[in-house]
């Protein structure tokens, strides 16, 4: 999504796991892009290096929310949703969330995050309920969102299926052995 948008407008991606080298930032497709793509990476604050995983995430979220200077904020996963929600409130900027999974339907995360699961669930719930728009990647995901967050206005939840970069795919030749596999399982 960011590469396609960057063909038309300036896009800044704020990411976890530290700064990015210029070589790691994808090139913008097209011959004459009208925008740009910038990736800014954030590290966990030193004071939180030994903290619970959710608190580490919150530390990065606070940095991201503080730095946002945008016309619109797009977030996905609870990691980014808290940063998006905080930035929305701090900078009065519209927030759009794309849902790929939902914390209430991933209870095994309690084992991974311990009490941090309560924090991740809270962060996601608040972000969804205050988002200006929520994008579900399927009709089933839309139903799950409305089940998990019944206070969310259903009119704010729309379905937009995941996309692919068509230029990265090509139809195999007629004699490609992959067709036999396709025919067997199709």
Each predicted region: which residue ranges?
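A short, charged, and often flexible helix/loop element on the N-terminal side
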Residues: 29-68, 112
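Short His-centered aromatic/hydrophobic patch
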Residues: 75-80, 99
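A short helix/loop element that forms part of the nucleotide-sugar donor recognition site in Leloir-type
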Residues: 170-186
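Carbohydrate-associated surface elements
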Residues: 17, 140, 160-163
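N-terminal subdomain of nucleotide-sugar transferases
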Residues: 1-31
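Histidine-centered beta-alpha loop that forms part of the nucleotide-sugar donor binding/catalytic region
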Residues: 99-102, 161-162
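Nucleotide-sugar donor phosphate/pyrophosphate-binding loop at the beta->alpha transition
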Residues: 93-96, 104-126, 173-174
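A short beta-strand/loop micro-motif in the catalytic core of glycosyltransferases
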Residues: 73-74, 129-139
């Amino acid at each position: 999504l960011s590469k396609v948008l960057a063909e038309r407008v300036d896009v800044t991606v704020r990411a976890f796991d530290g700064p990015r080298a210029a070589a790691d930032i994808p090139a913008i497709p097209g011959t004459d892009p009208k925008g740009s793509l910038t990736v800014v990476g954030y590290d966990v604050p030193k004071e939180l290096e030994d903290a619970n995983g959710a608190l580490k995430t919150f530390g990065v979220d606070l940095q991201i929310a503080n730095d946002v200077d945008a016309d619109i904020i797009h977030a996905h996963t609870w990691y980014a949703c808290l940063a998006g929600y905080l930035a929305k409130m701090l900078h009065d900027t519209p927030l759009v969330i794309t849902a790929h999974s939902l914390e209430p339907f991933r209870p095994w995360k309690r084992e991974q995050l311990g009490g941090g699961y309560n924090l991740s669930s809270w962060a996601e719930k608040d972000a969804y309920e205050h988002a200006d728009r929520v994008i579900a990647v399927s009709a089933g995901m839309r139903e799950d969102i409305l089940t998990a967050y019944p206070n969310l206005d259903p009119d704010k939840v729309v379905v937009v299926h995941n996309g692919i970069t068509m230029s990265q795919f090509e139809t195999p030749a007629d004699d490609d052995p992959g067709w036999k596999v396709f025919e067997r399982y199709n």
